[in-house]
From Swiss-Prot:
The keyword Transferase applies. Residues 47-352 form the AB hydrolase-1 domain. This is Homoserine O-acetyltransferase. It is found in: Cytoplasm. The keyword Transferase applies. Keywords: Acyltransferase, Amino-acid biosynthesis, CBS domain, Cytoplasm, Methionine biosynthesis, Repeat, Transferase. Homodimer. It comes from Methanococcus vannielii (strain ATCC 35089 / DSM 1224 / JCM 13029 / OCM 148 / SB). The lineage of its organism: Archaea, Methanobacteriati, Methanobacteriota, Methanomada group, Methanococci. Residues 375-431, 440-492 form the CBS domain.
Amino acid sequence: MKKGSVGNVETKTYALPNELVLKSGKTLKEVNIAYETYGKLNKDKNNAILVFHALSGNAHAAGIHKTDGKLGWWDALIGPLKCIDTNKYFVICSNVLGGCNGTTGPSSINPDTNKPYGIDFPVITISDMVTLQKNLIDHLGIKKLFSIIGGSMGGMQALEWCATYPEVINSAVIIATTSSSSPQQIAFNEIGRRAIMSDPKWDGGKYYYKNQPSEGLALARMIGHVTYLSKDSMHEKFGRCLQDKNEYGFNFETDFQVESYLKYQGDSFTKRFDANSYLYLTKALDYFDLTKNGSLSDAFEKLSAKIMIVSINSDWLYTPEEAKEIVSAMSTSGINVKYHEIKSIYGHDAFLIENGQMSYIISEFLSEKIVENIMTKNFSTIYENETIKKAASLMVSKNITHIPVVSNENKLLGIITAWDVSKSIAEENSIENIKISQMMTKNVITAFIDDKIEKIAIKMQEYNISCLPVVDQNGLVIGMISAENITNTITI
């Protein structure tokens, strides 16, 4: 079948019913969040994927926007039969807090003054962005996200979700990012901010009814854009080629193609982005640090989701070494984490360019479901000195066919099934007097939380079993997985 587009889309807006309390302690009134959705939320509301955009992105991640006809910034990856398959998943992307594409930010109207906030807008953090996103997810009635996916600043948002709302996510793909902004990254952001604030048209951030500080914003974008490229990609794209001339001009006009390219990037950016938003979002990047309250592994101590960390070998803004630090911290916390390094000459921007590699990584990761994702955690157990009658009563009241037999420490000793109960009755024994220990199966086939679903399905078929206890490394029962669980998962 041919991969397709989600078609024409429009941006929706959700207005928070209450004030938003920020990390700084300040509050925002009348907060709006702009978002788009693709695909359908299923009946159980367990097929939602939340996608996060990078610094200059917006909620329009896929499809063709009804207002301007523009294609979504990740349209190559989101859509029917694409790696983020909208035939299977309900995909959500929102504009971040502090942005300038529909979500409340410095260009929004301050309800207290009826004028744009400007720099009266409170300084925000990545954590504040995530808090607003959680409000949106709650509004949509989603209790648990199938996955979260983001690159660069979007990767920071994904990490913040892992640390703040670990119980809400099943998995995460975290791309080309860091767990804390480095001095070098902060330095580039500060240079960009100074370029904007040094532009006379910035006027203390009060330029909304005049002209935007376009020269300062363009310069900030030029500086930032260099960090998204690599030495090799710039050499391949531009070399030392001149722009529309054969000889040097011997003046301070544009000579080289790379100069013309950066000027174009800067000028075009001013037509779609707000200068004050650039100040606020880069400041949020600077403040991002998951290690500030202790070790990085401590930030993930409650995380049980499976994780994919992706880096780019030529990325010098958020290096592979920084990605590996995240992998190490998660591994220390016992998290099921995988790592993939994209091979590309395109630097930081490769996650938006290398569509083939990104599609493979994401599709393989999303389709690789493990026991932990679907097992039943609310299950019944029984002791070996209890009776078959007790087991029969449990099976009827709970509508189950398999009950793990455990010790006082919850260690697996055996399993009792509906077949065992039926056998006792058929043999005309008094089930009131028969102990579980007399009828239970002691050699139990089990599953572990990180087993692949495909492996468990094969095991069930091989042994003609419809339900398995899930145990940890100490043999303690932590869940149950049934053929029905697996069937329901395959249909997502």
